[in-house]
Amino acid sequence: MLASLIGGIFGTKNERELKRMRKIVDQINALEPTISALSDADLSAKTPEFKERYNKGESLDKLLPEAFAVCREAAKRVMGMRHYDVQLIGGITLHEGKIAEMRTGEGKTLMGTLACYLNALSGQGVHVITVNDYLAQRDAELNRPLFEFLGLSIGIIYSMQSPTEKAEAYQADITYGTNNEFGFDYLRDNMVFSLQEKKQRGLNYAIIDEVDSILIDEARTPLIISGQSEDSSQLYAAINSIPPKLQPQKEEKVADGGHFWIDEKQRSVEMTEIGFETVEQELIQMGLLAEGESLYSATNLNLVHHVTAAIRAHFLYHRDVHYIIHNGEVIIVDEHTGRTMPGRRWSEGLHQAVEAKESLEIQPENQTLATTTFQNYFRLYKKLSGMTGTADTEAAEMKEIYGLDVVIIPTHRPMVRQDQNDLIYLNRNGKYDAIVKEIKNIQETRAPILVGTATIEASEILSHKLTQAGIRHEVLNAKQHEREADIIAQAGSPDSVTIATNMAGRGTDIILGGNWKAKLAKIENPTLEDEERLKAEWERDHETVLSAGGLHIIGSERHESRRIDNQLRGRAGRQGDPGVSRFYLSLEDDLMRIFAGDRVVGMMRAMGLKEDEAIEHKMVSRSIENAQRKVEARNFDIRKNLLKYDDVNNEQRKIIYSQRDEILAEHTLQDYIEEMHHEVMVGLIANFIPPESIHDQWDIEGLENALRVDLGIEVPVQQWLDEDRRLDEEALVQRITDEVLARYHARREQMGEESAAMLERHFMLNSLDRHWKDHLAAMDYLRQGIHLRGYAQKNPEQEYKKEAFNLFVNMLGVIKSDVVTDLSRIHVPTPEELAELEAQQQQQAEAMRLSFEHDEVDGLTGAVTHHEVEEQPIVSSDHIVPPSSRNAPCPCGSGLKYKQCHGRL
């Protein structure tokens, strides 16, 4: 109330921002007559002039009015499009490192060219980030003529691109690509063996298209490059026979003979006592568990992992909802966009369990080699901005996590779409029948209809019902993504009915009357007559659709995010066009079933509604919106929590990657190696000669043996002490270090500077990468169990920081020890051996392909692409010796029962 009163007096923050930017727009418009008078050559020559002025110290802010005026004039001449004033405001917003919320169809792609052009003048590169390869390619090719006219180069990055092409794309003034590809290139750049292999030239400025999808929906998605671990395919296949014999328990706290309880919110399962006993018996019969042995003993934790994955695969992940089968592979379906994600795989053995369930070939599990999150990757950019049709509902999160303000850009023409109230039915069948009936009614007006569904399953049920009703229609879901552009291009034609799974991120406008240019492109060698005919047909169809009320949007289910619902609605009413939208819901919808209050559901059931009857009530609509707010708040908390923990990992990641860059950049690493020798010697000697100890406590024999075994060097420590009794601890350390270094220098001289430097670089990078990989696994295990510290009255976050720091320090010590040991024990290599070593490094670098993991916290779903780099067992967590009963207190000291703590699945 108070906020709205103050806003009414002083104007909202958004209104004040728009008022300030309109003054800059006035400056741009004032330059238009002068810029329009320039010849093409003079207009193109403005770019080198701006670059020179920038290099002499003029800021981009100062150049903005003139640069925007030049870009607008160039777009007018090259593309036949002139930026509206609202697009200029959007361009200013992007340049200032903010998020521009612009309605669908208002020209976000054209708006982005302004900020791209201005920021490319710095010569440091601009990255334009999209949600898929199709949009990156489309936008780059659409804008290429404009930027090339202005003297700027364009690059496109994509997966499986040759190293040369990718390097050239990153050297371009403006580079287009997907968020995944940019993120993976960053990780890959920090796994190379020479600076020349790096592709990215720094993270200067990024414009993220569909910014809410990338920074919100995929924020808790770690990017992971991984390698194969041990093969457990036979075990997955064997355990797959167990879940069909089990029954879920209906409620968590009410024992009803069920074997496990399902938590749909967390997408996790917890075994009951009966479940444990049943599974144990099954495993004993299979010969996987010895008679009298317990499933929850420390040695059988691997079996627990497999059983859990199998139950989740059978009861929580369903075909044509969470995944599809294509060419004998399980392909994940993105829950936010409805797109398939080829190559991505769920983690924690879930993907293998689904493959076993579907009787497909089971691929091996993976181990993490390098990882970051989108949250931390995008915060590395010096300046970040974004554009979307829907960001205002997540404005607080954008500000808190990324420091990005959201500016709502006014529409060029007033929005006249009618958003009608939701209709709620008793069950899904009644809802689907009502949708079919409504489609029949709308078809009488010849208006185009877009039906949005949340799952592939729902789209196919509706498609079946429409077919039975004799209604012609198109289906756009993960199974038809190859025809996506064609389907969307004609979705605005009269009489068209299109069923689409989650329109979020589709990135293509639906033009009322259809897209005559798309039809023309399909004609081989089109003539001018063809063009005129198609234009005339479109004008006739366009008028038909306008008179029918525009595009009609039917939502078959509310998404858990209001923003996704708004994106579906936003497909209608573009640029002042008419349109209608309405959502059809049922009590069986996941959002209603899981999150809506029992009181609302009970009240609706008590009303005695029939299957074909609907209610339309503000209280129910409010309840649905509150449910969505709860889910959004919960997901925000998860993302914030992920960031808290990943910030710890991120600081360590920065140190490791910085150290890697130093190793690659230095011509010689001799100083580093000598320093390492000294540190390692101090640590090694301290194991046998404790600091500030007396001679009687010294283990000289053990020290000499360690030097012989670890470093391959004979050091007569006892002889030195016999010869000089005054030799103290400090002097002894120095003398041993000098002896080891003398041997190192002699070998170095024998190899020659170039060969020695290459060998040192190889050992340092190899040790760093190997132990960093193991450290990531150890950090994963630490994170999975750190919440248990809360039961011991400790702060899990602080405990995580402390433990992570100790792990990191230990890792650095082990890396140094490894390098010194390897360099001490290796024989002087021949030129042929050095050449072979270099070839191996090249093969390893070329073998690195991206893999991608969704590994969401708290058991939420995730995906990982597996790529075999080398076979390595995953570091195991500390074992907890189980008590005699699962109801006994857990030995970890948490105060919980064992079954609710370390014995929990």
UniProtKB/Swiss-Prot annotation:
Q: How is the cofactor bound?
A: May bind 1 zinc ion per subunit.
Q: Which InterPro entries match?
A: Helicase_ATP-bd (IPR014001), Helicase_C-like (IPR001650), P-loop_NTPase (IPR027417), SEC_C_motif (IPR004027), SecA (IPR000185), SecA_CS (IPR020937), SecA_DEAD (IPR011115), SecA_motor_DEAD (IPR014018)
Q: Where do the annotations place Zn(2+) binding?
A: 890, 892, 901-902
Q: Which GO terms describe its cellular component?
A: cell envelope Sec protein transport complex; cytosol; plasma membrane
Q: What is its EC number?
A: 7.4.2.8
Q: Matching Pfam families, A to Z?
A: P-loop_SecA, SEC-C, SecA_DEAD, SecA_PP_bind, SecA_SW
The membrane topology term of the UniProt record is: Peripheral membrane protein
Q: What does the entry list as the binding residues for ATP?
A: 87, 105-109, 509
List the cofactors: Zn(2+)
Q: Where in the cell is it found?
A: Cell inner membrane; Cytoplasm
Q: Which GO terms describe its molecular function?
A: ATP binding; metal ion binding; protein-exporting ATPase activity
Its main localization is membrane
Q: Give the function comment from the record.
A: Part of the Sec protein translocase complex. Interacts with the SecYEG preprotein conducting channel. Has a central role in coupling the hydrolysis of ATP to the transfer of proteins into and across the cell membrane, serving both as a receptor for the preprotein-SecB complex and as an ATP-driven molecular motor driving the stepwise translocation of polypeptide chains across the membrane.
Assembly and binders: Monomer and homodimer. Part of the essential Sec protein translocation apparatus which comprises SecA, SecYEG and auxiliary proteins SecDF-YajC and YidC.
- Which family, according to UniProt? Belongs to the SecA family.
This one is known as: Protein translocase subunit SecA
Q: Which organism is it from?
A: Acinetobacter baylyi (strain ATCC 33305 / BD413 / ADP1)
